[in-house]
């Protein structure tokens, strides 16, 4: 997948042009996938190039909520859907455009023959553009517009905000259903205090980068990918109240039964599948170890079913 960070005429798809999926696509949930898949399928049917057009917000911008995916994982996921070209200019580059300027710019820069968006898509300065205006602007130019209905979960529209709320509440099945895949993290393993190894339950320690959405603190059934293999695992997310007096430091510790290798400096994928229990302060380290062992057993049983 080719990635472009600035607007410029690209002549994508040559004489056959391109089909462009438009949106912010922050979580690549089932609604986002419907829009992207629509553009990819249209492009394949017409010999055109499948394209995603999105935009990049400043790191400190809170307009769209905390992040669900890293930039690298987002790119990999979009590429896996069959997208060949990914345009992602800075928001500052497009925020002052009128709806007309925005649409004409997309058509010109992407050599677009078809535009795909969700029914809640807005564009142009002050979000003045709507799907209906998009149709009106594109019709005289012979550009097809396809507006996808919002995906539904439990009879309500799917959104990244709902996914964040589900994660905050520890409702992993709901988050995963709306994402269309298990919620997962892929952060670098760093050295911890070594307590897990002392207890006989060595863990991998990962830190959530600033700006990422945190699930509810607690113990989770997870599975961890190391190389090409998946392992049942148990993950504790929180401030380690039994051994840590600094409640501002959040850690993500995963115990992988049966794995003994060195993962420091690597970035294994940890998928979240079920919330088991809230974080708590144990009176003894033996109680802490028993909790970890129990969670690991639950994880192994979960994936054996």
Locations of regions flagged by a protein language model:
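N-terminal catalytic cores of NTP/NDP-binding nucleotidyl/phosphoryl-transfer enzymes
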Residues: 9-65, 70
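Residue-level signal for inorganic ion chemistry
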Residues: 29, 78, 115, 175, ...
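Short beta-strands and strand-loop turn motifs
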Residues: 21-23, 53-54, 86-90, 114-119, ...
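Short acidic-hydrophobic, aromatic-tinged amphipathic segments that line or gate anion-handling sites
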Residues: 2-10, 87-88
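A short acidic, often aromatic-flanked loop/helix-cap motif at beta-alpha or helix-coil junctions
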Residues: 9-13, 93-96, 152-156
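N-terminal Rossmann-like or analogous alpha/beta NTP/dinucleotide-binding catalytic cores
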Residues: 59-141
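Glycine-rich, Lys/Arg-enriched anion-binding loops that position phosphate/diphosphate groups
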Residues: 138-238
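Phosphate/ribose-recognition catalytic cores of enzymes acting on nucleotide-derived substrates
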Residues: 192-305
């Amino acid at each position: 997948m080719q990635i472009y960070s600035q607007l410029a005429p690209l002549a994508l798809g040559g004489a056959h042009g391109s089909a462009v999926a438009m949106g912010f696509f922050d979580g690549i949930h089932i609604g986002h996938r419907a829009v992207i898949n629509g553009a990819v399928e249209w492009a394949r049917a017409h010999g055109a190039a499948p394209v995603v057009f999105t935009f990049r917000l400043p790191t400190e911008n809170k307009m769209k909520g905390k992040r669900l995916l890293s930039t690298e994982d987002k790119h990999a996921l979009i590429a896996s859907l069959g997208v060949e070209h990914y345009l992602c200019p800075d928001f500052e580059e497009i925020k002052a455009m009128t709806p007309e300027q925005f649409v004409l710019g997309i058509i010109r820069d992407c050599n677009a023959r078809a535009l795909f968006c969700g029914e809640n898509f807005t564009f142009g300065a002050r979000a003045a553009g709507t799907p209906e205006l998009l149709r009106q602007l594109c019709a005289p130019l012979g550009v097809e517009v396809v507006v996808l209905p919002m995906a539904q979960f439990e009879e309500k529209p799917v959104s990244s905000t709902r996914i964040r709320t589900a994660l905050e509440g520890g409702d992993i099945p709901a988050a995963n259903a709306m994402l269309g895949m298990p919620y997962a993290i892929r952060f670098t393993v760093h050295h911890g205090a070594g307590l897990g190894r002392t207890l006989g339950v060595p863990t991998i320690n990962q830190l959530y980068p600033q700006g990422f959405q945190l699930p509810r603190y607690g113990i989770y059934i997870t599975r961890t990918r190391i190389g090409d293999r998946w392992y049942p695992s148990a993950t504790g997310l929180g401030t380690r109240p039994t051994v840590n007096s600094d409640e501002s430091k959040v850690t993500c510790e995963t115990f992988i039964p049966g794995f003994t290798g060195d993962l420091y400096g690597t970035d294994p994928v940890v998928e979240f599948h079920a919330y088991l229990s809230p974080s708590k302060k144990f009176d003894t380290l033996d109680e802490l170890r028993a909790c970890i062992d129990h969670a690991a057993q639950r994880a192994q049983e979960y994936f054996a079913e």
